[in-house]
A protein has these predicted regions:
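Short, surface-exposed beta-strand/loop micro-motifs that present aromatic residues
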Residues: 35-37, 134-135
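Short active-site neighborhood of thiol/selenol oxidoreductases, capturing the structured segment around
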Residues: 38-61, 77
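Loop/turn elements at helix/coil->beta-strand transitions in domains of secreted/extracellular proteins
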Residues: 42-44, 73-76, 132, 141
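Short, internal strand/loop/helix patches
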Residues: 78-80, 94-130
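Thiol-/selenol-based redox modules, centered on thioredoxin-like
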Residues: 123, 131-167
Length: 167
């Protein structure tokens, strides 16, 4: 059932869901250091978290739907490739490969790669596995998770996002 994909972070205690998105540091593909979500305070943030290279298609579909419905005007939208911490050489190599594949400055700017303990990050957000993308709507100043979901965002999700951020 689609309804089960959503967890409102303000749900009653006992659901086990985190309320605050953890601060993570990374660099966008334009080589600018960013701290997510702390550096995004002008608008609510939609963060799309991907764990596998093949998730890119789902990330692209999600962002396309958000932009087609003018969510880019109301929200900061970023994608966060989460990669297990590796050697500096491997990080440089992966970043270079991603930059070579993505030429669009706007897409490079919103893609913030983080190298960290992937399991620790997933545990902090109560993500059971890395089989699909996860998305989070994060309050612009409190870093609280207003809404979250798994998989490609749907038109029904857009309604939920609008409702969750109307207050």
């Amino acid at each position: 059932m689609v309804e089960e994909r959503f967890v409102n972070a303000a749900a009653p205690a006992g659901k086990g869901m985190p309320v605050v998105f953890p601060s993570v540091q990374g660099k966008n593909l334009n080589k600018v250091s960013k701290t997510v979500p702390d550096d995004f305070t002008t608008q609510h943030l939609i963060a799309i978290v991907a764990f596998q290279q093949w998730h890119q298609r789902n990330v692209d579909q999600t962002i396309e739907l958000l932009e087609k419905n003018a969510f880019g005007e109301q929200f900061e939208i970023i994608e966060i490739p989460v990669i297990q911490k590796a050697t500096r050489f491997r990080q440089i190599r992966l970043d270079a490969l991603m930059r070579a594949a993505i030429r669009d400055h706007r897409i490079r700017n919103r893609t913030i790669t983080v190298y960290l303990d992937k399991n620790e990050f997933m545990t902090s957000l109560d993500i059971e596995d890395d089989a699909s993308i996860h998305w989070f709507v994060i309050h612009r100043s409190a870093n609280t998770i207003l809404l979250r979901g798994e998989g490609v965002i749907t038109p029904k999700d857009l309604e939920r996002i609008t409702t969750a951020t109307d207050s």
